[in-house]
């Protein structure tokens, strides 16, 4: 069980926040069909909420058929159709760049899309994290530093260069790519986006920009749930961190928005609508 977390944000119903987070983990394949869930008491300690709130969240998931609870037995994940689907092959290769603030759910969206389509998923943290941590330590910095001038000016640009090289190599091989990273600076720069559009077009591919919207309190819940060491500074200074976050930000070019707030639609359903739109656009080219 992970270490205790700070209290969950209270502006949205707590049970709904927890249920949505668990549902996203099921759809993203992090929680597998038949997997045993921790007890209500363990989950309550993990989320720093009451057992009653956990039971409410589990009831919401049970009503959707995502969790099964039997008398005197542990709750288990119920997702029998969770196996990866056959690969979706659009006419033209597709590149889906997914951006969003920390805790917005962009990686979960990428995983859901990858499971639905069979397309490669290129996540910045997965591809670069261990190298970044080693580089930071060589500079005498904490491996979890993501705020220093050294990280922002020297290491972060190299992370994105590596990510985009991996994307380009897949395109050169005729493969689709799902690319996930914050992209906050990049998506604010129209020139940067146009350069990537040109690169994709020259390789016979179509680029789609996706921004994951999430309200501040739900982002806080997701960051806590992730419980990653690199988020420690954000969590310890959350209000200060949020002063630099514009939840209403949108890229200055045509793009699609996925709403991952509690009041938004189910992420998996939004992901499937996105796939339909991508394949439809590809056929029309």
Task: Label the predicted regions.
Residues 2-3, 59-96:
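HTH-adjacent hinge/linker in prokaryotic transcriptional regulators
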Residues 105:
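Conserved glycine(s) of the Walker
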């Amino acid at each position: 069980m992970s270490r205790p977390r700070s209290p969950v944000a209270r502006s949205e119903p707590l049970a709904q926040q927890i249920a949505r987070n668990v549902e996203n983990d099921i759809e993203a394949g992090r929680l597998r069909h038949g997997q045993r869930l921790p007890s209500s008491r363990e989950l309550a300690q993990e989320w720093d909420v009451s057992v009653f709130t956990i039971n409410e969240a589990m009831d919401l998931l049970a009503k959707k058929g995502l969790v099964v609870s039997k008398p005197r037995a542990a709750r288990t994940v119920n997702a029998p159709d969770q196996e990866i689907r056959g690969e979706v092959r659009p006419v033209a290769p597709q590149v889906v760049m997914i951006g969003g603030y920390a805790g917005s759910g962009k990686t979960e969206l990428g995983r859901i899309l990858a499971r639905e389509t069979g397309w490669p998923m290129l996540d910045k943290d997965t591809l670069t994290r261990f190298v970044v941590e080693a580089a930071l330590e060589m500079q005498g910095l904490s491996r979890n530093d993501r705020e220093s001038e050294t990280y922002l000016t020297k290491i972060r640009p190299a992370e994105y260069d590596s990510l985009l090289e991996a994307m380009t190599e897949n395109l050169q091989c005729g493969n689709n790519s799902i690319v996930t990273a914050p992209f906050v600076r990049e998506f604010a720069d129209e020139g940067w986006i146009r350069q990537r559009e040109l690169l994709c077009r020259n390789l016979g591919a179509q680029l789609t920009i996706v921004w994951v919207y999430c309200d501040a309190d739900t982002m806080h819940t997701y960051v806590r749930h992730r419980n990653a060491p690199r988020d420690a500074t954000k969590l310890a200074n959350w209000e200060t961190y949020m002063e630099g976050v514009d939840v209403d930000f949108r890229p200055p070019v045509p793009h699609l928005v996925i709403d991952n707030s509690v009041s938004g639609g189910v992420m998996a359903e939004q992901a499937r609508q996105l796939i339909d739109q991508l394949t439809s656009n590809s056929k029309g080219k």
